[in-house]
Amino acid sequence: MTSATQFDNVSVVKRANVYFDGKCVSHTVLFPDGTRKTLGVILPCALNFGTDAPELMEVQAGKCRVKLDGSSEWQTYGAGESFSVPGKSRFDIEVLETLDYVCSYL
């Protein structure tokens, strides 16, 4: 069962995913239906990420600005908001306040 604040009946990969010299750290959560999410934190910085699969980024806390590949406009997101990123693309993210996020791979 999943609630707004937790995921139940899941497995968690113990080894952390550490990117960009520790500016982005996450853990992978595996669900019984075969889907996966990562739960992570990004420290204030500016980064460029690449995606394989489409992603849904849900901001739990903090604040960021995002510019999707091919766009010239930045969008700002805060706690309770989310943004989607197409697969096989890139996006720029500027973290203004330490970002606590859930990333779903669609």
From Swiss-Prot:
Keywords: Glycosyltransferase, Transferase. Its EC number is 2.4.2.1, 2.4.2.2. One of its GO terms (molecular function) is uridine phosphorylase activity. It catalyses: a purine D-ribonucleoside + phosphate = a purine nucleobase + alpha-D-ribose 1-phosphate; adenosine + phosphate = alpha-D-ribose 1-phosphate + adenine; cytidine + phosphate = cytosine + alpha-D-ribose 1-phosphate; guanosine + phosphate = alpha-D-ribose 1-phosphate + guanine. Disulfide bonds: none annotated. One of its GO terms (cellular component) is cytosol. This is Pyrimidine/purine nucleoside phosphorylase. It comes from the Bacteria. It comes from Burkholderia cenocepacia (strain HI2424). Catalyzes the phosphorolysis of diverse nucleosides, yielding D-ribose 1-phosphate and the respective free bases. Can use uridine, adenosine, guanosine, cytidine, thymidine, inosine and xanthosine as substrates. Also catalyzes the reverse reactions. It holds the Pfam family Ppnp. Belongs to the nucleoside phosphorylase PpnP family.
